[in-house]
Structure formats: C-alpha cells, structure tokens
C-alpha cells in the first residue's frame, strides 16, 4: 500500500516468500506505541541524499533476527488544527546498516514466545529512497499497522487468560488441603 514498486520488489517479495524476516520499530521507552510521543529523529542530509536516524526503540518483536525493519521517526513539525504537532515518517532500515545496533533481549512477563529486543540508531544513514510512503505520513502507517496487530495481541491475551483459568480450575479440583 505505501511502498514504491522498487521497494515492494526489493523487500516485500522476499518477506512474502519467507526468505527474509521483518520487524516494526515503533515502541519507545518514554512513549510506548504513542506515535506523537516519539523521540527517535530522522534528519535529511541533502549533501549525501540520506536520512540520518538517531534514537532507540524497545520491545521490538523479531528485533535481533529480522533482516528488514520499518522504523517510525520524527522528521519535523507540522501545524494541524491550529497547533504544532510532530511530523512522523516511516523508513525502511536493513540489518547491518552502519549505526544500527541491538540492545539486550527484553525481559517480559508474558508472550515470551517471541524474542523482543531494543533497536539503537546512532547516526544511522539510510538512503533517501528508503522513506516508506510520503514524508509526514508515518503516523498513518503506524496506525494502520497497529490496527491489524492489536486484534492479534488481544486474542493472545484472551487465550493466555483462558488457559490460566482452566489450569487453575483443574488444580483447585485436585488439590488436597487440611485432609480434604
């Protein structure tokens, strides 16, 4: 929906074939999944025709294992409805790009079947053509992605709760205490 034909051929086709693994970098330590709370910034360097990415993301599913990442970052400010808001854009970042590293594996209480890691960007230079969609349209991309993902996470949480309830009921029925 958002990518150019070149981006779709280069990234989407190998992802769809299962030849590559992808990850989505939105969540940040101080903002969670609030796209307007993002601190990660991308500044365009006209001299090199590159975006320079600085910041970090946390709790990123497939974080260390993905080959390609969609990363949400602030690219400026824009006036909307009479007030200044952050301009949010989305970028395609490939694993191995200089300035892109991983933090430690995140420790979680639940949904431990997926490895989540911190993504760190320090003067990470990505080509101008790796802007996904149009500049300033990253908020739409983030919301579209979250809309699809939230139902899956809710289903997982419901399944975990149901499993915990069933296990508890079985335990209570079999438990012996005070001679009963």
Regions found by a protein language model. Give the residues of each.
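Cytochrome P450 C-terminal beta-domain/meander region
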Residues: 34-54
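Glycine-rich beta->alpha junctions and the first turn(s) of the following alpha-helix
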Residues: 90, 100-180
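A short core secondary-structure module
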Residues: 50-102
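Buried hydrophobic positions in well-ordered alpha/beta secondary-structure cores of metabolic enzymes
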Residues: 4, 24, 42, 53-55, ...
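A short, Trp-centered hydrophobic/proline-enriched beta-strand micro-motif
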Residues: 18-26
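Short Gly/Pro-enriched turn/cap motifs at secondary-structure boundaries
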Residues: 30-33, 59-62, 81-83, 108-115
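Internal helix-loop-helix
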Residues: 1-19, 61-68, 151
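N-terminal glycine-rich flavin-associated loop
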Residues: 1-6, 32-35, 44
